[in-house]
């Protein structure tokens, strides 16, 4: 069990990609903190993990765009486990609209949840990682942050911002044996994408050379690799998990 004795915080882990990441890390021995604004979803995920794996899993309801909530989340983690080794900044939302119609609230909300949260969570954990002289931070960006998308100026800006943040943080923290990397998923089959109109899904699939949507487990496997010793000499990287979509 390569992550035995390690503690991971995963934001937005109540469902979808975040849940898959939490399950993957737990399956390899990590104790996990399931953070989600949806308290019931977080508790369900934590309960499922405890029933399947011989690890500890706690659920914390938090708004990761709120500094107080984030600091409390990290304090609760330290209180329960005494350390934090992995931070997976996965929480994110969309509020799609053409620029001409996009409201300031739609812009601000996406930037806060998708980008500001990455700053707040990272800042809150690094003092503990510095003390340990060890840490792995993985930020979930998107291919939309690399190529843009009609109707998603807010989301694309937030996800592009994560890429710049990842590279800057990687430079700042490397001397403390803390790596910071990002994963940029493409079209991944989740509850959110399943709600899209069929014609939209078909159009997205045409852009994927591998000819299929990705699965949350595809992303989780790359995150687990970046947390492992196999990736100890990798930092500041942006790894696309997109079936070739953004080649």
Predicted feature residues:
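C-terminal substrate-recognition "lid" of short-chain dehydrogenase/reductases
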Residues: 2, 130, 134, 178, ...
């Amino acid at each position: 069990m390569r992550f035995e004795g390690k503690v991971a915080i995963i934001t937005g882990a109540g469902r979808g990609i975040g849940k898959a990441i939490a399950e993957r890390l737990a399956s390899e021995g990590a104790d996990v903190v399931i953070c989600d604004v949806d308290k019931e979803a977080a508790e369900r995920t934590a309960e499922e993990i405890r029933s399947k794996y011989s690890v500890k899993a706690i659920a914390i309801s938090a708004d990761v765009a709120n500094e107080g909530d984030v600091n409390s989340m990290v304090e609760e983690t330290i209180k329960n486990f005494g350390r934090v080794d992995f931070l997976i900044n996965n929480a994110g939302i969309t509020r799609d609209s053409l620029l001409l119609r996009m409201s300031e609230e739609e812009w601000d909300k996406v930037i806060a949840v998708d980008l500001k949260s990455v700053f707040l969570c990272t800042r809150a954990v690094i003092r503990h990682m510095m003390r340990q002289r060890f840490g792995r931070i993985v930020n979930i960006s998107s291919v939309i942050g690399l190529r843009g998308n009609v109707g998603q100026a807010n989301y694309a800006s937030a996800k592009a911002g994560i890429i710049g943040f990842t590279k800057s943080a990687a430079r700042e923290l490397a001397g403390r044996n803390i790596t910071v990397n990002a994963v940029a998923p493409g079209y991944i089959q989740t509850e959110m994408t399943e709600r899209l109109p069929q014609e939209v899904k078909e159009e997205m699939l045409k852009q994927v050379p591998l000819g299929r949507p990705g699965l949350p487990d595809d992303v989780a496997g790359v995150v687990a690799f970046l947390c492992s010793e196999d990736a100890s000499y990798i930092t500041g990287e942006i790894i696309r998990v997109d079936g070739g979509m953004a080649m």
